[in-house]
Each structure stands twice: as structure tokens, then as C-alpha cells.
């Protein structure tokens, strides 16, 4: 990666994406020249992939995908070994079959021959791991591969109240690529499902806090409550709210700290420099965001001075103009509130243009980066001075560290999780958050198959609840109008007229 001289700020997301893409290429046995990366330029991805494969071979290492791939190649190239393993297993049972990928399925088919004594169990409505290569159509086409197969549909839900099961049926029946089945509940009756709209995200989070208190009065412990989001970043402000009201919680995913995001670090560096900080490290973060064409060679001391920069570029008037403009902007910044400063950095200094360029380079939507700026501005809105805001950041970061220690030892409190991480679990009370277009379905889901997967994800969230279920969405966020999720309107859970009013 570093030999490619990439400028990557969101390293964690970038490397996670790379690992997933390398896995997709191997599992799908996709010719490298026919794979188009969603993370970086295609030539760059191919170079990284080839270097990764070469390093694994020279180091005599196998990753999980290699184990599958080499197993398949061994079984297809060595009939003697294949026959030995076929004789060893008279019957094969595969659980969670909806999550199988093509390579795994091909291995299973080889092992099952010649008797084909296969017993598969799965729920096609819970296939939610396409990003790992899972293909629900494998399960759907199983009777075509094995025409003598018998199919048993298990449509009874023993977990959830009938009110919840009926709603889940309305949602998932909109998917066309599934086994048709009428879901019904073993437990009849139950509490009505609450579908609630809020003016903004803050009201949504405060509502959850109040409902949690009501549930406690009804004798439902924190451990029987779950708050579910489409993405981990969605929980940022709820976490802050719960800590503020001292409500215990446990994150199944990484605790989100907005202030550790690279965009937040850039903004903080701008403000620190405006307040008089002159370290080379801080200056390097922001000097070319947006691009001012400053060279690292101009920063030859541990401390940066504007006079030193002017001396370095004394024969380039246009560069001196850029230095003057930056100094002028920093002088303007230091007289602002944190909220005003963040917006000035974004619009006045031109940081938004840098984010647009970076988004294009990384093949991501610029709106994802703008959202971080908007959340950062919102977090700073109540503070009158930079010092007060920095104290809040420090205290919040410390609280998160303490929360992480608690989680490692206790695992107590309300469960906060993404929909992907909650599969297989169940709770008395579940809150499904931010059921808006762009969040659920996620804005990256544009094809029919990806929309169906998002609907399955929503279905998984709904069916985590035993007794109580809340489906919540906001009308506005960061001064932008939001649209209720199509999953609520198409199934008649929210009237279309109500959706149209929001447009």
C-alpha cells in the first residue's frame, strides 16, 4: 500500500474495504483484470492484490479464503483424495445455509457426491452478508441442483409476539427473490408496534431515553433492551445521551468517537494553529487541505513560522499570497465560536472542496464526509469558547475509554448494535433507529438485489424483538429534510401521503 504512495486518511475503513475486496476476488474466482475496486483506482487495487498474494506465498501463509480455494483445487485435481473424503462422510448437514458463498457451496457439492445426502437448513430472509460473498440465490436454486430434494418450510415464529411477526411479514413479502411463505406466530397477541416520526435526531434519541425508563418501570432490565442502527456511526449521539443520563449500555461494535475521526482531527488542528500552536505536526495536517501547494521542505524546524514560510517562497509571489491568505483565515478563526469556526473552515477556507476531491479519489460519496463535518458542528453548537469545547472532547473521550473497560469485564446494560452484528440474538424490547431513505436502505444500495438485502436486514432487526418494538425515523437531520424509508411506505406501515408531505 505504501509503495503505491496513496494518501489515505480513513485508513481503518480503507483496509477493511481492501480485505473484503481481496476476499471477494478469491471466493468468486474473479479474474483480476475483470474486477473493479470500490476503494481505490483499479490499477492500484490490482497492484496491492498481487503484492498481497506474493507476500503470502513467500511467507508460506494462507488466509481463510486460501484454505477454501486450495481445498477446492485439491479436490478437483486429485480424484483419489476426493474419493477418500467422500467415503468418510455418508451424510452432510449445513446450517445457516443462507450465508454460504459459491466457493463453499462447490466444496460441499464435491464432498456430497455420489450419494448427494445433503441436509441444508437456513432462512433465505436472513441472508445479509453479500459483502462477504454470500449469495441467497444459492439456497433458492438448490432444488434445481438437486431435483429430488424435499423442501420443508418452517413458517412458525416461536420468538416474537404476533403483532411483530405480522409486521415482519408485511415487510419481507415485498422481496421477490425468496421462498414464498406466510409467517405466523406461536405467541398470539402482544403489544402494538410503535412507528414514530421525530422532527430531528436529537428528539429521537431523547425519546429512546424516556422509553428506556418506562420499560424499567415495567420490570424489563437493561439487558433485555436493544437499540439497532444500520451503521455503527449512527450511534454516536445516542452514546453521548446515554452517558449524560448515566444509563448503562454495551456496544457490540467499536465505540464510536467522533473526535478521533480524521476530519475532526483536521478541524481541531486548524483551531489549535489559530490559537497559537505552531508545531510542525499540526501544520502538516492542514497545510494542503485545501491544496495550497506548500512543500514539506518549507517546514525544516519543529516549529513553523509564517515569516519562515515567506522567506522560503520569497521568489514566488503567488505562494506568498497563499501564505497571507492562510494567516488571515487563522486570525479570523480565533475570534469565532467553535460552531462558527467549523463552518468557516468548511466553507470560508475551502475544506469542503478538499473533501470533494478526496471522496472522488477514494470512490466514496462526498456526502458521507460532509456528514462528519455536520455532526462535528452540531457537537460544538452549545460551546462559547474553544477551551470549553476541548474540555468536553477530553471528558467524552475519557468516558468512552471507561465504557470500553466496563464492557470488557461486565457486558451489562442496553445493547447498542448494528443490524449486521445483532443477528442470532433476541430481546424483550427493540428500538430500530433512523429508518430513513439513505440509512435503511443504505445510500450505497442502488441495485434491485442490494435493495432486497437491505430489506432483509430490516427484517432481521424487526425479528430480534420478543414483546416490544419501536421503529423510529427523523424528518430532519443537520438542517436537511429526510425521507421516511420506502420499507415503511411500500408495506403500508406509513401512509404514502405522509411520505409525500416531507418532500
Per-segment meaning from a language model:
Residues 114-117, 123-125, 146-151, 189-193, ...:
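Short glycine-/polar-rich loops that comprise or flank the Walker A/P-loop
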Residues 147-150, 155-248, 274-276, 333-335:
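Helicase P-loop NTPase motor core
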Residues 38, 221, 236-241, 268-498:
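Conserved helicase C-terminal RecA-like lobe
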Residues 1-20, 33:
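Conserved P-loop NTPase-based nucleic-acid remodeling module centered on helicase motor cores
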Residues 38-141, 156-160, 424:
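Conserved helicase NTPase motor core
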Residues 10, 26-30, 115-116, 171-181, ...:
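Proline-centered turn/helix-capping motifs that create local helix->coil transitions or kinks
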Residues 126-130, 159, 252-275:
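Short alpha-helix plus adjacent loop in nuclease-associated cores
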Amino acid at each position: 500500500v505504501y509503495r503505491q504512495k496513496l494518501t489515505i486518511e480513513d485508513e481503518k475503513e480503507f483496509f477493511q474495504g481492501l480485505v473484503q475486496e481481496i476476499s471477494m476476488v478469491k471466493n468468486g474466482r474473479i479474474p483480476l483484470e475483470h474486477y473493479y475496486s470500490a476503494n481505490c483506482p483499479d490499477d492500484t487495487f490490482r497492484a496491492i492484490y498481487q503484492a498481497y498474494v506474493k507476500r503470502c506465498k513467500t511467507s508460506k501463509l494462507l488466509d481463510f479464503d486460501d484454505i477454501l480455494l486450495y481445498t477446492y483445487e485439491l479436490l478437483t485435481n486429485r480424484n483419489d483424495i476426493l474419493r477418500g473424503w467422500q467415503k468418510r462422510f455418508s451424510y452432510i448437514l449445513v446450517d445457516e445455509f443462507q450465508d454460504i458463498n459459491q466457493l463453499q457451496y462447490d466444496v460441499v457439492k464435491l464432498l456430497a457426491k455420489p450419494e448427494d445426502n445433503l441436509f441444508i437448513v437456513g432462512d433465505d430472509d436472513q441472508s445479509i452478508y453479500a459483502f462477504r460473498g454470500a449469495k441467497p440465490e444459492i439456497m433458492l436454486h438448490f432444488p434445481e441442483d438437486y431435483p429430488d430434494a424435499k423442501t420443508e418450510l418452517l413458517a412458525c415464529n416461536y420468538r416474537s409476539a404476533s403483532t411483530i411477526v405480522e409486521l415482519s411479514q408485511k415487510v419481507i413479502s415485498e422481496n421477490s427473490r425468496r421462498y414464498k411463505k406466510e409467517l405466523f406466530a406461536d405467541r398470539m397477541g402482544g403489544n402494538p408496534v410503535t412507528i414514530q416520526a421525530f422532527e430531528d435526531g436529537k428528539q429521537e434519541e431523547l425519546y429512546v431515553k424516556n422509553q428506556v425508563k418506562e420499560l424499567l418501570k415495567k420490570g424489563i432490565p437493561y439487558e433485555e433492551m436493544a437499540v439497532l442502527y444500520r451503521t455503527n456511526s449512527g450511534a454516536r449521539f445516542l452514546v453521548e445521551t446515554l452517558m449524560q443520563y448515566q444509563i448503562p449500555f454495551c456496544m457490540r461494535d467499536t465505540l464510536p468517537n467522533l473526535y478521533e475521526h480524521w476530519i475532526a482531527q483536521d478541524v481541531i488542528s486548524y483551531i489549535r494553529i489559530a490559537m497559537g500552536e505552531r508545531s510542525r505536526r499540526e501544520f502538516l495536517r492542514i497545510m494542503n487541505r485545501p491544496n495550497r501547494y506548500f512543500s514539506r521542505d518549507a517546514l525544516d524546524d519543529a516549529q513553523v513560522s509564517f515569516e519562515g514560510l515567506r522567506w522560503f517562497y520569497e521568489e514566488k509571489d503567488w505562494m506568498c499570497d497563499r501564505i497571507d491568505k492562510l494567516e488571515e483565515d487563522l486570525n479570523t478563526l480565533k475570534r469565532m465560536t467553535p460552531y462558527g469556526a467549523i463552518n468557516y473552515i468548511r466553507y470560508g477556507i475551502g475544506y469542503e472542496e478538499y473533501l470533494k476531491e478526496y471522496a472522488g479519489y477514494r470512490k466514496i460519496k462526498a456526502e458521507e464526509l460532509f456528514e462528519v463535518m455536520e455532526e462535528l458542528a452540531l457537537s460544538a453548537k452549545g460551546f462559547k469558547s474553544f477551551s470549553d469545547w476541548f474540555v468536553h472532547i477530553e471528558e467524552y473521550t475519557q468516558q468512552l475509554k471507561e465504557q470500553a473497560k466496563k464492557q470488557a469485564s461486565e457486558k451489562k446494560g442496553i445493547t447498542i448494535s448494528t443490524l449486521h452484528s445483532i443477528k442470532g440474538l433476541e430481546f424483550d424490547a427493540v428500538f430500530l433507529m433512523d429508518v430513513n431513505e439513505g440509512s435503511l436502505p443504505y445510500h450505497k444500495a442502488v441495485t434491485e438485489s442490494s435493495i432486497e438485502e437491505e430489506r432483509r436486514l430490516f427484517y432481521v432487526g424487526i425479528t430480534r424483538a420478543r414483546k416490544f418494538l419501536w421503529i423510529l425515523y427523523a424528518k430532519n437531520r443537520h438542517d436537511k429534510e429526510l425521507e421516511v424509508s420506502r420499507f415503511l411506505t411500500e408495506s403500508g406501515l406509513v401512509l404514502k401521503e405522509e411520505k409525500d408531505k416531507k418532500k
